[in-house]
C-alpha cells in the first residue's frame, strides 16, 4: 500500500469513527430521553409524542447557551496527550455502545456518560496502563458519580418541602393545575441541561480523535463547528425516538409523581446539571434525575419510594464503568491486532 492509499484508508477510518461517535450520541439521546420526559409523561402533563418533540427541541437549543467546558474535559482532560489513537477511540465507543444496548434492552436507566468514560478508561489502560490517565479529569468525574445524585436528591427534596409549605393552604386540584403549567418550564430546563452536558461528551471524543489524527491542533480552544452542530443534532434526533422501556421505570416504578413532584424533581435535576456543565464536569443525567425523583418521593414517606427498583438501578450504576471498560479493552486489543 503506497502513501496515498494509506492516507485514504486512514481518512475512511476516521470518518467511520466519527459516524460511530454520532451513533453513540444518537443512542445517548434515545437511551436518556426518559430522563428528560419521564416525569412530564407520568404526571400526564404531555403525551409521549409531544414530550419527545419538546425535549428534543431544548436538547438542541442548548448549543446556544452552554460553554464547551465538558467537551474540553473529555477531549483534553482525561488522557495524556499522545496516547489516543484510532484504536483507543474505537474501543471506547464500542464499550459504551455495548453497555447502552444491554441496559436499554433490560429497561435499566444506567448512564451513557459513565459508559463513555468507562470505555475511554478501558481502552487507554489496555494500551498504556493507568499512567496514561490524567488524575484531575478522572478524579472530578468519579467524584461527581456520587455528588450528582446526592445533589439531585437534596435539591429535589428541598424543593418539595419548600413548595409544600408555600402551597399548604391551596386545594390539591389548584396545586395540580398550577404545576401542570410550571412543569413545562422545569422539563424544558432539564432538557437544556441534558443536551448541554451530554452532547458535549460526544463532541469531546470526536475532538480527541481529530487531535490525535492531526485534523485539529492540540492548542485549539474549541472543536470544529461542524462537530458541535452534528453532535447536538444527533442527540436531539435520538431523543425524538425516545426510550419507552426506561420511561416507565423512571416515571412510574421508582415512585408515583404528581405534577408538583415532577416540577421539583426536574428543577433539582436541572440545577445540578447547570452547575456541573459550568464546571466542565461530565456527569450522569440519569443519576441526577433519579436522585431528584427519589428525593421528592422520600419527602412524602419512605414507603413512597420503591427501594427495590432504586437498588437495581444503583447496581447498574456500579457496574457501568467496569463493564464498559472491560468491553472497550477487548475491542481495543482486537482492533489493534486487525488493523
Q: Where on the chain are the PLM-derived regions?
A:
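Multi-pass alpha-helical transmembrane bundle typical of ion/small-solute transporters
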Residues: 1-339
Amino acid at each position: 500500500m503506497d502513501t496515498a492509499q494509506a492516507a485514504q484508508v486512514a481518512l475512511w477510518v476516521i470518518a467511520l469513527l466519527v459516524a460511530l461517535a454520532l451513533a453513540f450520541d444518537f443512542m445517548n439521546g434515545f437511551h436518556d430521553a426518559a430522563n428528560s420526559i419521564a416525569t412530564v409523561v407520568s404526571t400526564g402533563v404531555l403525551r409521549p409524542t409531544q414530550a419527545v418533540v419538546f425535549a428534543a427541541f431544548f436538547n438542541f437549543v442548548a448549543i446556544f447557551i452552554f460553554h464547551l467546558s465538558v467537551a474540553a474535559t473529555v477531549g483534553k482532560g482525561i488522557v495524556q496527550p499522545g496516547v489516543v489513537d484510532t484504536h483507543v477511540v474505537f474501543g471506547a465507543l464500542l464499550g459504551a455502545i455495548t453497555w447502552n444496548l444491554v441496559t436499554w434492552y433490560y429497561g435499566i436507566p444506567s448512564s451513557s456518560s459513565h459508559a463513555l468514560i468507562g470505555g475511554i478508561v478501558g481502552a487507554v489502560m489496555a494500551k498504556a496502563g493507568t499512567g496514561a490517565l490524567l488524575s484531575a479529569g478522572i478524579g472530578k468525574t468519579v467524584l461527581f458519580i456520587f455528588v450528582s445524585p446526592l445533589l439531585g436528591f437534596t435539591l429535589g427534596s428541598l424543593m418539595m418541602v419548600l413548595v409544600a409549605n408555600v402551597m399548604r393552604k391551596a386545594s390539591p386540584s389548584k396545586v395540580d393545575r398550577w404545576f401542570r403549567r410550571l412543569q413545562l418550564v422545569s422539563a424544558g430546563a432539564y432538557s437544556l441541561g441534558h443536551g448541554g452536558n451530554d452532547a458535549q461528551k460526544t463532541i469531546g471524543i470526536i475532538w480527541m480523535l481529530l487531535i490525535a489524527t492531526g485534523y485539529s491542533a492540540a492548542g485549539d480552544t474549541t472543536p470544529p463547528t461542524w462537530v458541535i452542530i452534528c453532535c447536538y443534532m444527533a442527540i436531539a434526533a435520538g431523543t425524538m425516538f425516545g426510550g419507552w422501556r426506561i420511561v416507565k421505570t423512571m416515571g412510574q416504578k421508582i415512585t408515583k409523581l404528581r405534577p408538583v413532584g415532577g416540577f421539583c424533581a426536574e428543577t433539582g435535576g436541572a440545577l445540578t446539571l447547570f452547575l456541573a456543565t459550568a464546571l466542565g464536569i461530565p456527569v450522569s443525567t440519569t443519576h441526577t434525575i433519579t436522585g431528584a425523583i427519589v428525593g421528592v418521593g422520600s419527602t412524602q414517606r419512605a414507603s413512597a419510594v420503591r427501594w427495590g427498583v432504586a437498588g437495581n438501578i444503583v447496581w447498574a450504576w456500579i457496574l457501568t464503568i467496569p463493564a464498559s471498560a472491560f468491553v472497550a479493552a477487548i475491542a481495543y486489543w482486537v482492533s489493534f491486532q486487525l488493523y
